[in-house]
């Protein structure tokens, strides 16, 4: 009996089925600048250089981390794709870039076209929210490489910003303020600690109703990462945004510090925003100290804008009108011993 690729663990027919299932969905993200059809070796995107005096391309890549373990355990796969897009576009947004297009990498031990399509549906939804086109991707079937029914994801975003409009935080000065925009929950960071606390220490079940959360645990943990593209572009021409920070791994201290000039520190008021119940649950079950919580999790703030003091009310009004919960969370001060002080 002769051996075949399928017997070795790679099912090309299933891959072809997958492509046929996702093609019409993916096309719904296409912008007018997309020049290619699905299935070519490369994606082509012709952005309008006339819109920019000196266009600069901006790129970013990221994954979803161990949040995927929650998707596996709950057998719910239609939101982690949103997380993937959010993690990438929110990063390139921090320098003022408009997301143009996105590519994904999906790898699994045995391809299940239906399940993989659910993941792509989430990526498509995320791309639509961010305004970028999904112009390509890679699907890798890797026998005996992953555990049964598991997969991994990576995403790649490319955007553009005019060179004179690049935002890097260098103009932040004493007296400027920090506007925090609410997260939807854990987003896509800290899940290794969250899972350890909730499942190993707390002995909670993925399908268990948690009164403090007013929902089952899986629903809370799989809330998609917020996408902040519309928030920035609502502010862009009305407020001078001097810096932006995407609050991911490392929390507020680890991420806000990345954009502050050497002589500037941030003084933040932890009582100025609402910390979602999931963080209190993790803190209480795990008996985790507050400093560690802020170091690992976003603690309810997913994105931070730095603006001048006289634009506080305008910024808050614009963001709230766009449907974002925004708070004045602190101010910039002259350099001290600690880069970030949360009190």
Curated annotation (Swiss-Prot):
<keyword id="KW-0436">Ligase</keyword>
<dbReference type="InterPro" id="IPR004733">
    <property type="entry name" value="PurM_cligase"/>
</dbReference>
<dbReference type="GO" id="GO:0006189">
    <property type="term" value="P:'de novo' IMP biosynthetic process"/>
</dbReference>
<dbReference type="Pfam" id="PF00586">
    <property type="entry name" value="AIRS"/>
</dbReference>
<keyword id="KW-0658">Purine biosynthesis</keyword>
<keyword id="KW-0547">Nucleotide-binding</keyword>
<dbReference type="InterPro" id="IPR010918">
    <property type="entry name" value="PurM-like_C_dom"/>
</dbReference>
<dbReference type="Pfam" id="PF02769">
    <property type="entry name" value="AIRS_C"/>
</dbReference>
<dbReference type="GO" id="GO:0004641">
    <property type="term" value="F:phosphoribosylformylglycinamidine cyclo-ligase activity"/>
</dbReference>
<dbReference type="GO" id="GO:0004637">
    <property type="term" value="F:phosphoribosylamine-glycine ligase activity"/>
</dbReference>
<keyword id="KW-0067">ATP-binding</keyword>
<keyword id="KW-0963">Cytoplasm</keyword>
<dbReference type="GO" id="GO:0006164">
    <property type="term" value="P:purine nucleotide biosynthetic process"/>
</dbReference>
<dbReference type="InterPro" id="IPR016188">
    <property type="entry name" value="PurM-like_N"/>
</dbReference>
<protein>
    <recommendedName>
        <fullName>Phosphoribosylformylglycinamidine cyclo-ligase</fullName>
        <ecNumber>6.3.3.1</ecNumber>
    </recommendedName>
</protein>
<comment type="similarity">
    <text>Belongs to the AIR synthase family.</text>
</comment>
<dbReference type="GO" id="GO:0005829">
    <property type="term" value="C:cytosol"/>
</dbReference>
<dbReference type="GO" id="GO:0046084">
    <property type="term" value="P:adenine biosynthetic process"/>
</dbReference>
<dbReference type="GO" id="GO:0005524">
    <property type="term" value="F:ATP binding"/>
</dbReference>
<dbReference type="InterPro" id="IPR036676">
    <property type="entry name" value="PurM-like_C_sf"/>
</dbReference>
<comment type="pathway">
    <text>Purine metabolism; IMP biosynthesis via de novo pathway; 5-amino-1-(5-phospho-D-ribosyl)imidazole from N(2)-formyl-N(1)-(5-phospho-D-ribosyl)glycinamide: step 2/2.</text>
</comment>
<dbReference type="InterPro" id="IPR036921">
    <property type="entry name" value="PurM-like_N_sf"/>
</dbReference>
